[in-house]
Swiss-Prot record:
Function: Catalyzes the reversible cyclization of carbamoyl aspartate to dihydroorotate.
Catalytic activity field: (S)-dihydroorotate + H2O = N-carbamoyl-L-aspartate + H(+)
Root EC class: hydrolase
InterPro entries xref list: Amidohydro-rel (IPR006680), DHOdimr (IPR004721), Dihydroorotase_CS (IPR002195), Metal_Hydrolase (IPR032466)
Name of the featured protein: Dihydroorotase
PROSITE patterns, alphabetized: DIHYDROOROTASE_1, DIHYDROOROTASE_2
A cellular-component GO term for this protein: cytosol
CDD domains, per the entry: DHOase
Cofactor note: Binds 2 Zn(2+) ions per subunit.
EC numbers, comma separated: 3.5.2.3
Domain of life per record: Bacteria
Length: 344
């Protein structure tokens, strides 16, 4: 196949940042996606409906003229989030989910939850009003190997969570292991998962090919090849429990290429083309539309998009660097050739 026309997709996990950084990256997402679930881990984080409303207005003001884009807002769950805030979030109609970060697990997560059980009152309110919970599914215990954090999170926190709240809609975000795939498949239909392009395309070997490769470093970290293959099988299976979430995370070149570099891969520029390469690698390009355009809105109980986009088999070179405050932004696979191209 040299040409694929499909329904315009959505990104169900996106970091836009704020201010000048947001203005630099938002056009990339708007070009590819109609909607996106916007992560709340700003400084300070988006903790209230008022915070979300203000951030939403800043995003809409930065959308390029003549373009359409709908930001789907989230709240940052803390130990102090109240059930009343959840009710207000649901009533707002623009807050679509609440995000759980284990304290210290990733970028700007210092104010995250210290113990998920402390949030049972809030989770009960979320279950009652049908507000989805988005999970960064890793433990942060210092004695747990970084490559095992997702598996331990499932056993220690996730299984007990869905047992306590069986009607709570849960998105296990950016899954990275065969263990996570198995869990999602075994759970009820209120549990789904997003998968990033980097976790479909690369194993952890890429981090050390020819030296340290900081622009492939993200959290959860890339895993072994057998885990990558399990994710690819899940994404291309047609199962509606799995859908697109880039976790595109812009960091300046300086903040990535340092003695203590930030976690995050930037893929918003070319995410759909990256997913197309992954799906084509296992002869499943026909399953891309479901994964990218249908499964997400169906889970979130939103209408599917109606606009069409076209991908063409037309190789192009990913830029070495993109404009970004401070020191530029290096996209995933910078300088390499990619085989699919999204039409204008």
């Amino acid at each position: 196949m040299r040409r694929l026309t499909m329904t315009r997709p959505d990104d169900w996990h996106l970091h836009l940042r704020d201010g000048a950084a947001m203005k630099a990256v938002l056009p990339h997402t708007v070009r590819q996606f109609a909607r996106a679930i916007i992560m709340p881990n700003l400084k300070p984080p988006v903790r209230s409906v008022a915070d979300a409303a203000s951030y939403r207005e800043r995003i809409l003001a930065a959308v390029p003229e003549g373009q359409q884009f709908e930001p789907l807002m989230t709240l940052y769950l803390t130990d102090n989030t109240s059930p009343e805030e959840i009710v207000a979030a649901k009533a707002s109609q623009f807050v679509k989910a609440v995000k759980y970060y284990p304290a210290g697990a990733t970028t700007n997560s210092d104010l995250g939850v210290t113990d998920l059980r402390r949030c049972d009152g809030v989770l009960a309110a979320m279950e009652q009003v049908d507000m989805p919970l988005l999970l960064h599914g890793e433990v942060t215990d210092g004695d747990i190997d970084v490559f095992d954090r997702e598996k331990v999170f499932i056993e220690k926190h996730l299984i007990p969570l869905i047992t306590r709240f069986p009607k709570l809609r849960v998105v296990f975000e950016h899954i990275t292991t065969a263990d996570a795939v198995k869990f999602v498949l075994s759970a009820n239909n209120n549990v789904a998962a997003t998968i990033t392009p980097q976790h479909l395309l690369f194993s952890r070997n890429i981090l050390f090919t020819g030296g340290i490769r900081p622009h492939f470093y993200c959290l959860p970290i890339l895993k072994r090849e057998d885990h990558r293959l399990a994710l690819l099988q899940a994404a291309t299976s047609g199962n509606p429990k799995f859908f697109l979430g880039t976790d595109s995370a812009p960091h300046s070149r300086y903040s990535k290429e340092s003695s203590c570099g930030c976690a995050g891969c930037y893929s918003a520029l070319h995410a759909l083309e990256l997913y197309a390469e992954a799906f084509e690698s296992v002869d499943a390009i026909d399953q891309l539309e479901g994964f990218a355009s249908f499964h997400g809105p169906d889970f979130y109980q939103l209408p599917r998009n109606t606009e069409q986009i076209t991908l063409t088999k037309s190789p192009w070179r990913i830029p070495d660097e993109l404009p970004f405050p401070e020191s530029g932004l290096v996209p995933l696979r910078a300088g390499e050739e990619i085989t699919w191209q999204l039409g204008e």
